[in-house]
């Protein structure tokens, strides 16, 4: 599995580098000993039962960069956090996947902060939809409403329990607007496979 993960990561990133218009340095022209500026990535695979690492690739070439992106690269979590927002609401409120949630525009602020009007990625709003659709289609406005239903403190506590660390006390967390590592996200996701 380790060799496959290494090969797959390099293959996918090489494909991206070969796209027309790709303007950044490429691994194929990198000179050893110089700063590593070419496209990087990370892969981690865990055994859901034991948490054992099955494969881990911290970058494209350890010889060029010893920085392990699996453990050390903090990136915005984004929509990968939405399953935890929904899981919290399912557990704490009894929300069911078939329960309808509004996907219309929303305006909100938190603790007297500025008003925020998030959009859906496709720029549309679809009215009442089953909550499962909100998760499956990653609808931002529905995810915020589901997060509010479950409660920001409950979502933050779940995130702490799953070792996401400190996350903002703001509704932006419902959309994953905070940073953590690939290892943290992968470890947290294993709860869905074991429940």
Task: Identify what each model region corresponds to.
Residues 90, 97-98, 162-167:
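Proteins synthesized as precursors that undergo proteolytic processing into mature forms
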């Amino acid at each position: 599995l380790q060799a496959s993960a290494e090969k797959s990561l390099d293959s996918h990133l090489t494909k991206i580098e070969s796209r027309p218009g790709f303007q950044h340095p490429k691994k194929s022209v990198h000179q050893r000993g110089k700063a590593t500026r070419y496209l990087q990535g990370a892969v981690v695979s865990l055994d859901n039962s034991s948490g054992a690492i099955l494969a881990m690739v911290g970058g494209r070439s350890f010889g060029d960069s010893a920085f392990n992106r699996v453990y050390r690269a903090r990136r915005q979590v984004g929509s990968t956090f939405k399953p935890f927002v929904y899981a919290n609401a399912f557990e704490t409120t009894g929300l069911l996947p078939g329960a309808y949630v509004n996907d219309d525009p929303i305006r909100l602020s938190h603790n007297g902060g500025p008003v925020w009007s998030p959009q859906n990625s496709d720029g549309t709003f679809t009215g009442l939809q089953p909550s499962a659709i909100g998760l499956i289609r990653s609808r931002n406005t529905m995810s915020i409403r589901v997060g509010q239903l479950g409660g920001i403190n409950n979502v933050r506590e779940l995130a702490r329990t799953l070792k996401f660390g400190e996350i903002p006390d703001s509704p932006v967390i419902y959309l994953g607007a905070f940073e953590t590592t690939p290892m943290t996200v992968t470890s947290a996701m294993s709860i869905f496979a074991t429940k």
